[in-house]
Amino acid sequence: MSDMIRVTLPDGSAREVARGTTPAEIAAAIGPGLAKAALAAKIDGELRDIMRPLEEDTNLALVTSRDEADALELARHDYAHVLAEAVQTLFPGTQITFGPATSDGFYYDFAPTAEHGPFRDEELPLIEEEMRRIIAADKPLRREVWDRDALIARWKKDGETFKAEWAAELPAGEEISVYWSGDDWMDMCRGPHLASTGKLDPAAFKLTRVSGAYWRGDQKNAQLSRIYGTGWLNRKQLAEHLVRLEEAAKRDHRRLGQEMDLFHLQQEAHGSVFWHPNGFVVWRELEAYMRRAIDAAGYREVKTPQVMDARQWEQSGHWGKYRENMFVIPDEVPNTEDEGPIVSDDAEWMALKPMNCPAHVLIFRQGMKSYRDLPLRLYENGCCHRNEPHGALHGLMRVRQFTQDDAHIFCREDQIVEEVRNFCALADRIYKDFGFTYAIKLALRPEKRFGSDAMWDKSEDELRNAVIEAGLATEQYGWEELPGEGAFYAPKLEWHLTDAIGRTWQVGTIQSDRVLPDRLDASYIGEDGERHRPVMLHRAIFGSYERFIGILIEHFVGRFPTWLAPVQAVVATIVSDADDYAKAATARLVAAGIRTESDLRNEKINYKVREHSLAKVPHLLVVGKREAEEGTVAIRTLGQDGQRIMPLAEAIAMLKTQATPPDLKVR
């Protein structure tokens, strides 16, 4: 074996270097500026430590802070390790478990000592101070490879039972990498890491909160303390992020949902939503809007059972792939005379549906279908249940019971591209009605999947070609292909909405599926008189009503457009002499189809204005003695200064226009 290897750089130039040379040494040979700026290396596209020796011919790219995505991933990973070291320094006996980088920071899960108990938010400044001390010490971050059994013994000796358990599940004889911070602290980690803690900016991170978590996300396991932080490359990025967090807090749908009396959640129905009258108005408006859209697009609405036999889920493939996220119950009447229900060993099992697709196939299979019957578009506002971990639940954004605007299009091979293109046009119109821009992504085959490579090639090409024909595969629409992100049965197109403060939310999807029709034996009679499998297009636009409403609340800061607002107008009196006129005005507004309430309380008008503004009522119609005599109203519109005086009839006409859903307006 030669002592020299060939290293090819991004510009195409190549260098012969000694085997064992590090990327850091190559950076230094190129120039002192690059040596200082280089943070890590990409070896044949894979992110690696800059101090890790090169052992074979390779393509090398040096990562600097200009490569922001890679640099942020490295920095956040390192902040997580520095956090763990700081906690163990300050609180001896605390066990470390797991701590990854996240989309805007990092977290680490700890098992505190029984004497200390769970960590508290007020301890975060102390931990931050210790983290800055570790960063200032510029401790080298050194990779070391251990034998699995030796590492398990080391973790047990150090009292790190969680790490020992994790290591014990790795294959016997496997070498495991650990990273040392200096010579006095280590963690088990695949890496990569920066060369030293001093590469981090001590003013570019902040610990944000503490929460509970469970070992491996399972509530049956030990409860842990999770410390969250946000980490960036410099203090300017951190400051900008904190401003975004402050703005996001103002828009938090959980707080606004309470203030506007839209919904609530409670432990007795963990992960399920109690919709209040105001919130359910929003729900019903969205439901009516979507029904009009799908009716016009040629869909037929159906309703399917909540509970189905486990054998159906086994046949569809969901039981093997999705069982741990399903709510399962025995198909047997419990023996109520005993202390608790008894389930026999041979009991049959039922499951609450986590998705609607198998049931729609069963509808398709009822009665013989001809090629002339296709495409058949079945739509359902389908209520589903998924057993999400407690720690993953988040307001309306992540729930256990949710309703999808779900549809499945059964079509022939020659109809796929047109159906996908039509769906793209439908989704575009709907998202624009709500004021959203979006990016569209193609999620490609995952490592674990059903079906042949040829089938996946065909399905991916069909989705790709439909987007190209629709003119959406462009930079304007954020077109991107995402390897490994598809469902286990099909590739999918994803719609990522951008809200008022620049955050993105993945909502709509369409998937081209040849697996499920085959597994559930769906067929139609072709023009040739033979049986053929339909292709099944799974699609949704809102995703789920719960999550979409949460997104709308935050996007509009609770200030829904008039057509969606639970209460569209309030008629408020200045003096009691105007009470009768206010009642009559309210009645006329209600008769015109405007959701209106009257406020006749003996309160100052400024108090009423403030209260209804906080409730996000879009229009306040103020009436006093003069308005009653002249048949006028003084209209105040939420978010605008001043007021307009106009005849009541004119005000009703204006509000009727604003209360008209966008799809019912002349386009």
Curated annotation (Swiss-Prot):
Task: Identify which cofactors the protein needs according to its UniProt entry.
Answer: Zn(2+)
The record places domain TGS at 3-64
Sequence segments annotated as region (Catalytic): 252-561
Q: Name one GO cellular component term.
A: cytosol
Please name the GO terms of the biological process aspect recorded for this protein, alphabetically: threonyl-tRNA aminoacylation
UniProt xrefs under SUPFAM superfamilies = Class II aaRS ABD-related, Class II aaRS and biotin synthetases, TGS-like, ThrRS/AlaRS common domain
Chain positions recorded as Zn(2+) binding sites: C357, H408, H538
Broad class of where this protein is predominantly found: cytoplasm
Q: What is this protein called?
A: Threonine--tRNA ligase
Protein species of origin = Sphingopyxis alaskensis (strain DSM 13593 / LMG 18877 / RB2256)
Lineage of producing organism? Bacteria, Pseudomonadati, Pseudomonadota, Alphaproteobacteria, Sphingomonadales
Q: Which gene encodes it?
A: thrS
